[in-house]
Amino acid sequence: MKLQNTLIAAALALAAAPAAAQQVTFMTGPQGGSWIPLGGALKGMWEKAVPGLSITQTPGAGIANVRGVDEGKAQLGFANSSTTVDGIAGRAPYPKKVTKVCQVANLYPQYFQVVALSSANIKSFADLKGKSLVTQPKGNTAEVLTGEVLKLNGLSYQSLSKVNFQAAYTDAVSLMTDGHAQVFTLGTTAPASAVMDLASARDVQLVPVDDKTMGALKKANPGYNKLIIKAGTYPKQTQDVPVIGYSTHVVAACDLPEDTVYKMTKAMADNIGSMAAVVKAIEGVKPKDMALDIGVPFHKGAQKFYKEVGAL
């Protein structure tokens, strides 16, 4: 009887014990963008959905996040579909093929925005010659795309009068506001809070992508597509503006436990409204949208969830 009571007590103690702690790092985005607040919302819902999960959120950027997860510096990250595909293929700016990063979910479109001071008289990418530019640090998705756009238009950073590389959108806005830069490039949602802040201080305009540049980009990487920033998105924007687009998605280390990623994926699908409250573009996203194949291998946990709900 004593042995039986001891076994029962041990079983009850085990059942009551808290889940084993699981510490993970989640790389998000630069200050002033949408990834930091969205990361905070995901952190809350994931920690609630997975007992024992503790998430440390750190700033990041699309390409840096993919490399961080691949190199074991983080287990979760936001990324951009176009440049994640570059990593899987081992194309520049990645030094080697990315092999330890798996797809969790597509979330919403990103808009590559070329924002110019109205006084700079920049109507096309070709007009960037001789102008001063601020973009993100080397290796950031928007910075890489800035370089590609310049190249496709017969230009380079050397063709500009000055180039600033700033990690925080807020710092870039300050440079533009003070007149130390004439053009600001960034990849984020539309409207972007950083651009709204800038537009409240200076008259600005969006530079449209031309068909030749768009066609060349899409031929090199199918992850790019043309999006439209509708008239009225920003102050004094009277016309629709075509821009280069790609998707924001969540990636995870392929060796992150299957059950953990399954619960995280389910939590996202069950809380679209909570995410859309932070990033309006997520509104109406369905599991089939989250499960769209972008050329990045699915994590087994995410794949399990999508198959269960008929999205794969």
Predicted feature descriptions by range:
Residues M1-I8:
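Bacterial N-terminal signal peptides that target proteins for export
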Residues A9-A15:
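Bacterial N-terminal signal peptides
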Residues G33, V50-G52, A61-A64, E71, ...:
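Extracytoplasmic
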Residues S81-T83, G90-P93, A120, S156-V251, ...:
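Pocket-lining segment of extracytoplasmic ligand-binding domains
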Residues L38-G44, T56-V98, V114, T170-M176, ...:
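Pocket-flanking alpha-helical
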Residues Q239-L312:
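Segments of small-molecule ligand-sensing domains
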Residues A15-A21:
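Sec/Tat signal peptide C-region and signal peptidase I cleavage site
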Residues V24-K48, L53-T56, Q110-D178, G273, ...:
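Bilobed "Venus flytrap"/periplasmic-binding protein-like clamshell domains
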